[in-house]
Amino acid sequence: MQSNISIYVLTVIGSCFYNPFILTYECRDDCCNGRYGPVPAPWKVLNCTKTGPGCPDSGYLLTTSENKTYCITGNETDKGNYPQTIGAIFPNCSGMNVGAGRLITRMLEEYPRGKSPSNNSINNIKISC
């Protein structure tokens, strides 16, 4: 009886270690792996990298100065306070701003000569998902 339990335990452990789901992308550093969250402030982002081939979640990995990694995708641009600045500041994130599923569209307002705009309306940014 004890040997049957041991074989069962080894079988369960073995199937966990050789699960193709885990081996393909679950633990890869170049996939999102559930690292979603609010978009960090742009001055805290040190690096921006597109997710790797074969990842189930296409997006961009933002690494911050606090050594945290966040993944943002087209459906997540409304999270955080700074999504509109990421593509402008980091050139390797510029792919987020093109194509039918682009993340950001900008609408610039015109102002009468000699009148300075308020801080709230310098760039009227519209986020489109």
Curated annotation (Swiss-Prot):
- Lineage, top-rank taxon, reads Viruses
Instruction: Tell me which SUPFAM superfamilies the record gives.
Output: Interleukin 8-like chemokines
> What GO MF annotations does this protein's record show?
chemokine activity
Q: Does the keyword Disulfide bond apply?
A: no
Offer a single GO CC term for the protein. extracellular space
The UniProt entry, under InterPro entries, shows: Interleukin_8-like_sf (IPR036048)
Q: Does the keyword NAD apply?
A: no
Q: Which cysteines are joined by disulfide bonds?
A: none
* The entry's keywords: Cytokine
The UniProt entry's sequence similarity note says: Belongs to the intercrine beta (chemokine CC) family. Highly divergent.
Spell out the protein name for this chain: Putative CC-type chemokine FPV061
Gene source species: Fowlpox virus (strain NVSL)
Upper lineage: Viruses, Varidnaviria, Bamfordvirae, Nucleocytoviricota, Pokkesviricetes
